Amino acid sequence: MSHRVLGTERISPREEHVLTPNVTAILVAAGRGTRAGGGLAKQWRPLGARRVIDWTLAAFDRATQVSELLVVLHPEDMDLAATLTAAKPLRCVSGGATRSASVACALAAVADPEAIVLIHDAARPVVSADLIARVVAGVIETGAAAPALPVVDALWTGAGDRVTGMQPRDGLYRAQTPQGFHAGAIRDAHAAATGAAADDVEIARAAGMPVAIVAGDEQNFKITYPQDFARAAALLKERDKMDIRTGNGYDVHRFGTGDAVILCGVEVPHDRALMGHSDADVGMHAVTDAIYGALGDGDIGQHFPPSDPQWKGAASEIFLRHAVALAAERGYTITHMDCTLVCERPKIGPYHAVMKAKMSELMGLQPDQVSVKATTSERLGFTGREEGIAALATVTLVRT
């Protein structure tokens, strides 16, 4: 691996909005490891309410960056393919005699050479949404990326039961998966590989590909020994606890010269326009802030500073899409949104249905999960004096 570490930083929200690569998650589940004990291969063994492979599959199924799922099975396990389920497109292929051969079988099934592939051990069921997002961002930025943790313990060499020396730990990392590449590049690297390889990073580097390190996760360990099942089950039970969050958002914009206002993504004719650094969509801003609030992650001003000229006149749906994607990356599903617009004029009623449809589309929600309504302030305050429009929003998030 190269020694550049791409910690937890993200690509910019504008880049995130524009870049929507096709991402295939390849889950390697063709092994026959015996160290974990039991009669079944470890990926098929129960882990709480699900099997190991089901937990792993669900993690990538929830990841917003992932487009499809490709599972590599042992030839004798192909009859179990029908027991695997996912919301996203799911395919299963038969693996080979070694891990590398199994990965090569999966890569042969990915048609787009520019697609990003995330190659992951099915026996790492506690992989997080944040880690998946970091690897995808690393591939977008550098072409290849993999998670790892720096070695922090002292390292010895030994013979039998005696210490024979010390090993410097500077520059040493514990490798994890998913390891991300462009499909065509890593497929060519596998085709050129000779001999055994510890993982796909070794194969990539042998082909001359630089690989960036992204920050790994201590919980993303590989089930290897019998005691690992209890540890993984405890972590997944804790993660699976019901976590419901509510966020509130409030925004206001004053009137200025113009002939229309934009509210909840819909242009409404009016004798004035709302003033703001972006398109001044007060409704969408309130909803976006409500999502950030539920995540405990600041507000629009922190993610899209008004001092940054790139957001001058920007469409507010960029901000909302960013907040929705951020919630999904952190493992949350938005289950409901309620937005109230406060103004004397323009009248919102004729545009209510199209506003609701627009917000449903942008947030990936059903119509009955979205409410957009309007009220007046009975001629009181700045909205009553028709100096501007205010909006309040409440959003509910559930960890999935």
From Swiss-Prot:
One of its GO terms (biological process) is terpenoid biosynthetic process. A divalent metal cation binds at residues 251, 253, 285. GO terms for molecular function: 2-C-methyl-D-erythritol 2,4-cyclodiphosphate synthase activity; 2-C-methyl-D-erythritol 4-phosphate cytidylyltransferase activity; metal ion binding. Its cofactor is a divalent metal cation. The record marks 169, 222 as: Positions MEP for the nucleophilic attack. Keywords: Isoprene biosynthesis, Lyase, Metal-binding, Multifunctional enzyme, Nucleotidyltransferase, Transferase. The record marks 35, 42, 277, 376 as: Transition state stabilizer. The keyword Metal-binding applies. Coiled coil: none annotated. Its EC number is 2.7.7.60, 4.6.1.12. Residues 245-400 are annotated as: 2-C-methyl-D-erythritol 2,4-cyclodiphosphate synthase. 4-CDP-2-C-methyl-D-erythritol 2-phosphate binds at residues 251-253, 277-278, 299-301, 375-378, 382, 385. Residues 1-244 are annotated as: 2-C-methyl-D-erythritol 4-phosphate cytidylyltransferase. It catalyses: 2-C-methyl-D-erythritol 4-phosphate + CTP + H(+) = 4-CDP-2-C-methyl-D-erythritol + diphosphate; 4-CDP-2-C-methyl-D-erythritol 2-phosphate = 2-C-methyl-D-erythritol 2,4-cyclic diphosphate + CMP. Disulfide bonds: none annotated. Pathway: Isoprenoid biosynthesis; isopentenyl diphosphate biosynthesis via DXP pathway; isopentenyl diphosphate from 1-deoxy-D-xylulose 5-phosphate: step 2/6; Isoprenoid biosynthesis; isopentenyl diphosphate biosynthesis via DXP pathway; isopentenyl diphosphate from 1-deoxy-D-xylulose 5-phosphate: step 4/6. SUPFAM superfamilies: IpsF-like (SSF69765), Nucleotide-diphospho-sugar transferases (SSF53448). In the N-terminal section; belongs to the IspD/TarI cytidylyltransferase family. IspD subfamily. In the C-terminal section; belongs to the IspF family. This is Bifunctional enzyme IspD/IspF.
